[in-house]
A protein has these predicted regions:
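Metal-dependent phosphohydrolase cores
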Residues: 1-164
Length: 164
């Protein structure tokens, strides 16, 4: 599962690899903070935003570029399948997709600075400087994969039940 798929190609500080599942939980938290009162289905979409990586792994950007357009096409097809499985539209509305991407960039900035060894100025260039209110109280948690998996599954279940 996603709790066992390392982000940053596993090149992070700490006792545990930072997983796609942990990243996805953080993205959902940031997305929700930026969009209070947003429907549970869109929060579910946020937590599932990297779900295709259970099949294709979390490839670093230079590798994605080297693979070419086939990677993007596969990612889109897997994303559509995951969305349909969880009762979401195959293709998210553009404003929702943009809001999730914005939360993803805040998460990437935090990860880069806190656990991947980037200086803030480097992260600013790559991901944009996050708004201070999005950063307040945000921490990167490195936890055992089994704990992350349980948290991820519980979050998905809670959001799914809120969609009914």
């Amino acid at each position: 599962g996603l709790a066992f798929v390392a982000r940053w190609n596993g090149q992070t500080m700490g006792d545990w690899p930072y997983s796609v599942a942990e990243h996805s939980l953080l993205v959902e938290e940031i997305f929700h903070r930026a969009n209070p009162g947003i429907a549970a289905r869109w929060r579910l979409a946020a937590v599932l935003h990297d779900a295709p990586e259970y099949v294709i792994g979390d490839m670093i950007s230079p590798v994605k570029a080297a693979v070419g357009p086939g990677y993007g096409e596969l990612d889109l097809r897997l994303t559509a399948a995951v969305h349909l499985r969880f009762g979401l539209p195959a293709v998210l509305p553009v404003p929702i997709k943009k809001q999730i991407k914005a939360a993803d960039k805040v998460s990437a900035w935090l990860e880069a600075v806190k656990i991947a060894g980037f200086r803030e100025v480097e992260a600013d260039k790559l991901f944009g400087k996050p708004a201070p209110e999005m950063m307040k109280g945000r921490k990167i948690r490195l936890r055992p994969p089994t704990e992350v998996r349980a948290d991820y599954i519980a979050t998905v279940a809670r959001l799914l039940s809120a969609c009914d």
